[in-house]
Design a protein with these regions (language model features):
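Active-site-proximal C-terminal subdomain of hydrolase catalytic domains
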Residues: 49, 64, 140-230
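Structured segments of extracytoplasmic/periplasmic soluble domains
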Residues: 29, 48-52, 76-84, 134-138, ...
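Functional beta-strand-loop-alpha-helix junction segments that form "active/interaction loops"
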Residues: 1-8, 42, 47-90, 122-123
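Active-site-proximal beta-strand/loop segments in catalytic clefts of secreted hydrolases
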Residues: 22-27, 63-67, 95-99, 113-116, ...
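Extracytoplasmic/secreted envelope proteins and their assembly/folding machinery
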Residues: 23, 39-49, 60, 70, ...
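Disordered regulatory segments flanking catalytic cores
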Residues: 1-31, 82, 137-141, 160-163
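Caspase-like (clan CD) cysteine peptidase catalytic core
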Residues: 18, 71-97, 101-160, 229-230
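Glycine- and acidic-residue-enriched helix-capping/strand-helix junction motifs
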Residues: 29-43, 47, 197-201
Length: 230
């Protein structure tokens, strides 16, 4: 695939005092294979959040690699976000690039912080539903969530995430409770697919084309408004 360099300065929006962004990217894991380029994805997306969503520096929280522990991730979600979100006013963006994994029965999806143990999900990882429930309770005006991850139990380089190396891929159910209408959730892959890296761009495939789209490449009708369909 031929790729052009990303340019977060390609499109500039006015500052939006109501915009808040939480950005997490983890390439290096303590107990799992690397999620190639996920840290770069997050650092770049932070620039897009500033330039395209108009998020001010003091309204951005970014956690990368060793800083994206379970404790720091929980602190960002359950302490930092409540101090930033104003009910019915805040336009919230969340970006996560890294590993995800489903429970053995496929009913729960977890986001893996940098120090997670894939064999002890319920103790060391973040339940995705807990993230959603927290955001719902804070009641922001709009929510855009981008997940460059999959839940199949396989890394971007197709290494198994489980120490037991089971010869199966865990398939997550696509049921996660009712999501409010003001939520837009964009994911890199379906429950049984692998989220891949784009070698020549040095980004995840989803992240690269997402950010290219934010530059205006997805604005098919040239109205300067990016819709979900675009």
């Amino acid at each position: 695939v031929k790729t052009e360099p990303l340019n977060p300065l390609n499109k500039k929006s006015e500052t939006n005092k109501n915009a808040v962004a939480l950005i997490i990217g983890i390439e290096k894991y303590d107990n799992a294979p690397d999620a190639k380029y996920a840290n770069i994805d997050a650092k770049y997306f932070a620039e897009y959040a500033k330039n395209i969503f108009g998020v001010e520096d003091n309204n951005i929280k970014i956690l990368v690699d060793e800083n994206a522990t379970l404790a720091n991730t929980n602190s960002a979600i359950f302490k930092w976000l409540p101090g930033k979100i104003k009910e019915n006013k805040t336009e919230l963006t969340i970006f996560y690039s890294g590993h995800g994994l489903s429970s053995q029965d496929g009913k729960k999806r977890y986001i893996l912080p940098s120090n997670a143990d894939p064999d002890l999900l319920s103790k060391t990882a973040l339940l995705r539903k807990d993230l959603f429930d927290q955001i719902i309770s804070l009641n922001p005006k709009t929510v855009n969530i981008f997940f460059d991850t999959c839940y199949s139990g396989v890394s971007r380089d197709e290494e198994t995430l489980l120490a037991s190396a089971r010869p199966i891929r865990l398939v997550a159910d696509d049921q996660e409770g009712e999501i409010p209408k003001n939520f837009n959730i964009f994911t890199a892959s379906k429950s049984d697919q692998i989220s891949s890296g784009l070698e020549n761009a040095k980004h995840g495939i989803f992240s690269y084309f997402l950010m290219k789209g934010l530059e205006g490449n997805a604005d098919e009708n040239q109205d300067n408004i990016l819709t979900n369909g675009e």
